[in-house]
């Protein structure tokens, strides 16, 4: 608490790229000219489960005393306040945003731990709209919760049992 009360160091560190929660985020400037998009960001809001979408323009680390630090993403946000104008949901639950509708705010920052990476795919019918695709974190895999017995081990056990029975039959014939 004391570190926060004293405020951050007067110097801040700016990054073009930052890895957190299995995502590799880049600023929009760094993304330009690349084949991949890593500057798209989504933040899940608490009010009415509304999500906010934007592009990272700056990554800033504020350092405090005793080695504490906070990383903030400065973003250009899209205005998704009204359905049909700022965003659309199709019948499959896929979100599209109107990229011409910018949100002008005095609070463009989000904590790095709140950010979820997304990328935007241009809509074929209307170039002002883009479909939002949520990126899966790297090195995290969807593994089944139930532990199933390996099928291969059962086959091996049956095979060994069968071989033993065959050997016993051979002994009885002799």
Question: Can you describe what each PLM-predicted range is?
Answer:
Residues 1-174:
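Conserved, well-ordered core segments of regulatory domains
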């Amino acid at each position: 608490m004391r570190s926060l009360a004293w405020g951050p160091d007067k110097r801040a560190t700016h990054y073009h790229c930052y890895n957190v929660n299995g995502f590799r985020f880049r600023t929009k400037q760094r993304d330009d000219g690349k084949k991949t998009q890593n500057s798209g960001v989504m933040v899940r809001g608490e009010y009415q489960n509304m999500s906010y979408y934007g592009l990272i323009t700056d990554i800033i680390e504020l350092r405090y005393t005793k080695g504490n630090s906070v990383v903030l993403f400065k973003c250009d946000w899209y205005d998704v306040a009204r359905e049909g104008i700022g965003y659309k949901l199709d019948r499959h639950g896929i979100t599209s945003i109107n990229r011409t509708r910018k949100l002008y705010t005095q609070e463009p920052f989000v904590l790095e731990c709140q950010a979820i990476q997304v990328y935007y795919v241009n809509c074929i019918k209307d170039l002002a709209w883009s479909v939002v695709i949520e990126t899966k974190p790297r090195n995290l895999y969807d593994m089944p919760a139930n532990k199933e017995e390996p099928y291969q081990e059962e086959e091996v056990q049956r095979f060994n049992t069968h071989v033993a029975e065959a050997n016993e039959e051979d002994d009885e014939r002799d």
